[in-house]
Amino acid sequence: MDFEDLVTALAPPPNRVGKSDGPHEHHLYEGAVMLAFAMHLLRTQGARDVRIHPDGEHGKQFDFTTWLGRRDFTKISSIGSTTYGGVYGNPAGQTITVHPKSGLGDVVAEVGNHVISAECKGGIINTRHPGQVSRLYRGLCETVGLLMATPSQGRQIAVVPLTESTLRLAERLAPRCALAGIEIALVGSRGEVMDVKLAETAKVMAERTGA
C-alpha cells in the first residue's frame, strides 16, 4: 500500500505544542484506518466486497467519498441520509459499502467461507504527548475488548495505527489474544498493514529504531 492522503496534518492545540515529531500533529483518523484496512482486504486477502460502518463523527473527520474516488471507486448507490453513505465500486468489480451504522463491526468482509470482522481505532501517530500516547494504548485495548465481547463468526482483528508504542503493546498482547482467537493488525501512515507476529514485530522495531 502507498496512500499519501490518509494522514491529516493539523497544528497542535497550545497544550500539545512541541509534543510531536515536527510542527504538526499527524492524525490517522479512525475512518482512515477503516479504509486502509478495507483496501488491504481487497488487495491481499481475496475479498471482493467489504463493508465499513463509520459513525457521524468519522464522516466529519474524513472525506470517504473523495478518498475512494481517487482510487477509482465510484458511488453506485446511496445508503442512509449522509452524503457519503453508499456502495462504491471500481472497474475490477470490487465494492466498498460505507454504511453509517454502529454495532455491526467497523470493517466486515466475507472471504471464502468465513467472515473477517475488524474493530478499528485512530490516533495521532507522531505524538509524544502522554495523554495522546495513552489514548493510542487505550484504543488497542478497547478494540480487543470489543472483539472479546462479540460472538465470533470467523476471523476477528483489532486494527489501530502503527507507532512504536502500539507496536510494543501489540507484541505483549498478541500471545493472549491468539488464545482468544483475536488477531492484531497495525496500519502505517501510508496504508501499509502489518499483521502482528512476534518475530515480525522484533524486526520492525529494529528497523524503526535503527538498531
Where are the regions that the model predicts?
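Non-catalytic C-terminal interaction segments of nucleic acid-processing enzymes
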Residues: M1-L10, S134, E164-A211
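Short amphipathic alpha-helical segments and their helix-coil junctions
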Residues: L10-S20, H114, I125-G131
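Active-site metal-binding core of divalent-cation-utilizing nuclease and nuclease-like domains
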Residues: D49-I125, L136-G139
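Acidic carboxylate-rich catalytic motifs and surrounding loops in phosphoryl-/glycosyl-chemistry enzymes
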Residues: I52-E57, V159-S165, G188-S189
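Structural alpha-beta junctions
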Residues: M39-D49, S152-Q156, P175-R190
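Nuclease catalytic cores
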Residues: D2-S81
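Catalytic cores of nucleic-acid endonucleases
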Residues: K121-A170, R176
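Terminal targeting/leader modules
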Residues: R16-Y29, P91-Q94, M205-A211
